[in-house]
Structure formats: C-alpha cells, structure tokens
Amino acid sequence: MEEYHRPCDEVGFNADEAHNIVKECIDGVLGGEDYNQNNINQWTASIVEQSLAHLVKLGKAYKYIVTCAVVQRSPYGFHTASSCFWDTTSDGTCTVRWENRTMNCIVNVFAIAIVL
C-alpha cells in the first residue's frame, strides 16, 4: 500500500493566497446584499464553510480555523483582536475586511502547520 504525502513545497503560510480565497467567498455570499439580521447565521456559516473548503482543496499540510463576524454598519465602528502562540516560521494568520454601505464583515483564518 502506498503512503499518501500531502504536497508542502513552500515553507510558511501564504497569507495572500488565503486572502484572495476568502475575499472571493465573501463576495459570493454578501455581494449585492443589504444587511438583514435574519440572514446573518446563514451568511456567516456559508462564508466559513466555503472558505474552509477552498483552503483545504489547496492540499497543504495545515489545520485551519476560520471565524467570521458580520455586523450592521454604524458610526460607532467595529473592533476585533486575536492573539496566538505558535511557530511563526510555519503557522500564520490572515484577516480579510469587507464592507458595503450597510454592513461590515471580518474573516480571520488561522493556519497551523501539520508536522508529519
């Protein structure tokens, strides 16, 4: 029986690649929509599930954590923060901020390298 080795040619997490993937997922779900509280659960679930599926399809040796927050746009602003204790040479994070005239969306991707 042959062993399967996941391709991992590059060292470190490619945040630009992840950013582009997540941005496309957000655009696909929220593009053209106005804020509607009744749709938030569906929208956030779709964004994290699609983002995760596309990241996994890259076939890289990472475990991913994807979070998403969608809030109604207001003059009061919206602030988030996160902190991680990990190997900065192989693990990484990417934050995507998206907005339209009625809402703001923040997606965080945390990638933790799998050491085989």
UniProtKB/Swiss-Prot annotation:
Subcellular location: Nucleus; Cytoplasm, Cytoskeleton; Chromosome, Centromere, Kinetochore
CC annotations in GO: cytoplasm; cytoplasmic dynein complex; kinetochore; microtubule; nucleus
Modified residues (3'-nitrotyrosine): Y4
Gene Ontology biological process: cell division; microtubule-based movement; regulation of mitotic cell cycle
Record keywords, A-Z: Cell cycle, Cell division, Centromere, Chromosome, Cytoplasm, Cytoskeleton, Dynein, Kinetochore, Microtubule, Mitosis, Motor protein, Nitration, Nucleus, Transport
Covalent S-S links between cysteines: none
One function term, GO molecular function aspect: identical protein binding
One Pfam family per UniProt: Tctex-1
InterPro entries for this protein: Tctex-1-like, Tctex-1-like_sf
Assembly notes: Homodimer. The cytoplasmic dynein 1 complex consists of two catalytic heavy chains (HCs) and a number of non-catalytic subunits presented by intermediate chains (ICs), light intermediate chains (LICs) and light chains (LCs); the composition seems to vary in respect to the IC, LIC and LC composition. The heavy chain homodimer serves as a scaffold for the probable homodimeric assembly of the respective non-catalytic subunits. The ICs and LICs bind directly to the HC dimer and the LCs assemble on the IC dimer. DYNLT1 and DYNLT3 compete for association with dynein IC (DYNC1I1 or DYNC1I2).
Role played: Acts as one of several non-catalytic accessory components of the cytoplasmic dynein 1 complex that are thought to be involved in linking dynein to cargos and to adapter proteins that regulate dynein function. Cytoplasmic dynein 1 acts as a motor for the intracellular retrograde motility of vesicles and organelles along microtubules. Probably binds BUB3 as part of transport cargo. Required for the efficient progression through mitosis.
Family from the record: Belongs to the dynein light chain Tctex-type family.
Protein name as annotated: Dynein light chain Tctex-type 3
Originating organism: Ovis aries
